[in-house]
């Protein structure tokens, strides 16, 4: 259990030093426009969740940051999608953070969305990575 706690502490420290709630998407687009975008998306696709996923400097840049995912999708499935998009090597571990909290792999995205969505209507997920084998 101590090993898990140490990993979480190390990752949390890395995220808070690296990220600190910074979002390129938020910086580029005003709150009003983001709110308008999420409302349009939610009206057009009521059973989908608008997600913004951004990566740390240690991961390759995503070709797109906006995702529209089914409500019943598990976070581990979304993580798999992101791993494939950035072509992450198997020996690299990837972690998702929402509001600087480590996301559990078996969580349902709808629960995460309703608990942590931003005031603009998007859920912001930050992906970071560490090498697990040296």
Where do the protein language model's features map onto the residues?
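Ubiquitin system architectures
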Residues: 1-134
